[in-house]
């Protein structure tokens, strides 16, 4: 909400932070979510400017690159930029490279991570799952090269072991997406829990901590 964003903008300012990352929490149709997000951001971008903080809107499992671009251009404020996450476009069945091409001029910072796809038969529904960097199917080299050539240096390395998210309901595969191939290649079972975990309840908390340390090492 704008009031929550205002509070966090002031926290960021007091900490000396130059940016504040956010993503939409709205529900509804895609257009409804976009309209509400535009409204919220339009309320707080002026305050962000006064505090010298850049708001970065993440492609957080909800919007395609063109939808995210549309939001930023509707708000039309220099203190609103985009946080590009390497894999989150997969949840809306958009190729990560195609998504980056669309939003690149507005990208301010980056989440660097790796993903695999899990078949519906193996996960209950078509699912994106996080794995240690380098063990997934995202085009890490090509994405990184494109971002570096654009001058981006704000990279955050994300540990997404045991993270998973379903494909958003109602989304259809966009141009360049071929399920089972490329960035959308399926990982075949059995699944090594040191690589990914789909069902946390199958392990004790102590085992999960040990497995995560194994994944990180």
Short names for language-model regions:
Residues 1-82:
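Active-site acidic/histidine proton-transfer and metal-coordination neighborhood
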Residues 65-79, 90-217:
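Histidine-acidic metal/acid-base catalytic patches
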Residues 33, 58, 87-89, 132-134:
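Short, flexible loop segments at the rims of nucleotide/cofactor-binding pockets, characterized by
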Residues 57, 84-85, 113, 157:
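Active-site flanking residues adjacent to catalytic metal/cofactor-binding acidic residues
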Residues 21, 43-54, 84-88, 137-141, ...:
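Short, basic, helix/turn surface patches
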Residues 25-27, 84-88, 114:
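Short, acidic/turn-prone active-site loops that include or flank metal/cofactor-
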């Amino acid at each position: 909400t704008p009031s929550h964003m205002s509070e966090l903008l002031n926290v960021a300012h007091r900490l000396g932070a130059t940016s504040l990352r956010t993503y939409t929490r709205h529900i509804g149709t895609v257009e409804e979510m976009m309209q509400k997000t535009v409204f919220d951001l339009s309320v707080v971008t002026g305050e962000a400017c006064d505090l010298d903080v850049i708001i970065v809107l993440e492609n957080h499992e909800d919007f395609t690159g063109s939808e995210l671009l549309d939001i930023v251009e509707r708000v039309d404020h220099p203190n609103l930029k985009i946080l590009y996450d390497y894999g989150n476009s997969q949840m809306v069945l958009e190729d990560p490279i195609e998504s980056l091409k669309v939003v690149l001029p507005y990208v301010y910072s980056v989440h660097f991570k790796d993903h695999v796809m899990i078949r519906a038969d193996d996960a209950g529904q078509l699912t994106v799952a996080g794995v240690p960097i380098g063990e997934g199917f995202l085009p890490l080299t090509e994405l990184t090269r494109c971002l570096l050539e654009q001058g981006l240096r704000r990279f955050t390395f994300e540990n997404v072991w045991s993270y998973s998210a379903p494909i958003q309901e109602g989304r259809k595969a966009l141009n360049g997406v071929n399920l089972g191939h490329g960035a959308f290649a399926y990982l075949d079972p059995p699944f090594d829990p040191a690589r990914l975990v789909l069902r946390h309840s199958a392990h004790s908390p102590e085992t999960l901590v040990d497995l995560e340390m194994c994944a990180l090492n």
